[in-house]
Amino acid sequence: MKNKPCYRLVSLFSGSKGNCTLLRVGETRILVDAGMSCRAIERALASVGESLSDIDAVFITHEHSDHTKALPVLLKKHPVPVHLSVDTAKELAACGFPTDYFFSHPPCYCMTVCGQREDAPEISVVSFPVPHDSRMCLGYRFCAQGETYSYTAAIATDMGCVTEEIRTALYGADAVILEANHDENMLMMGPYPYELKRRILSDNGHLSNANAASLLCELTEHGTRRMLLAHLSPENNTPELAYLTVRAALKTKGLCQDEDYFLSVAKRDAPVVLCDEFFDAERGCACGDT
């Protein structure tokens, strides 16, 4: 296939035990978060035909260990620029995180300013604030654009509510990875302590299936066609329930799976491919490479 560049968006892991996503545009490869062991990330990359040695940068959403635990080993094996907020870097340092690369070896760590555009080869990146119980939690919007093509993906997880800033960042994205953490009934009837339930349900907690479904219905009106439900709780959700909740909401809008949209659910311990496409230079869009 001669059409270039290729475009891949793959959830390698997603959930409370670890999160990591691969974005590839042409020969540029980016990881969003590195929350599993480095060895597990290497195996997951290999299973989808990629290699850690080809990664060009890592973008971190926030400091929680399920998003950062692989960084020390990963950077020893393959030193690359890591993009994260100053607050996230400070929080990791305060928690005793190995900080050899934080400030002493620039530009290994690139301090991300929320809302400011950053450019990697073939990709522009804009971060946006996401409400969560961390010092600074970010979502990311990635845009690949050339003379004859344009494609946008966005990632927003670990958020307790949907803000106007999140809507603005996600509107118009071709592909979206969005949190669908819990079913509210399962959470309330489950074994979690009351205070933990309150934290999860708060505006700085995690997004429910119902709230994810409502937002995805909005996004389809603004061009989103590929959607991946992420960061599912193993105690308070199931992949089937999350999928059916969102599909039912989309059906009320008259939309059909595989015709009007493509919906899938991320796995906790295995890759799920959301996009594996190439840009058609003549049509100016992304097309499936099958």
Regions found by a protein language model. Give the residues of each.
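Conserved beta-strand hairpin/beta-sheet module of binuclear metal-dependent hydrolase folds
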Residues: 1-48, 138-157, 175
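Active-site neighborhood of phospho(di)ester-bond hydrolases with catalytic His/Asp-centered motifs
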Residues: 32-35, 55-63, 83-86, 154-157, ...
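Active-site metal-binding motif and surrounding structural segment of the metallo-beta-lactamase
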Residues: 38-84
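Short helix-capping segments at alpha-helix termini
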Residues: 49-51, 97-100, 147-148, 220-222, ...
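Short, well-ordered alpha-helix to beta-strand connector turns
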Residues: 55, 99, 173-174
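Metal-dependent catalytic neighborhoods of phosphoester/phosphodiester hydrolases
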Residues: 69-78, 91-95, 237-244
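Metallo-beta-lactamase
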Residues: 86-149
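Cap/insert and terminal regions of metallo-dependent hydrolase folds
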Residues: 164-264
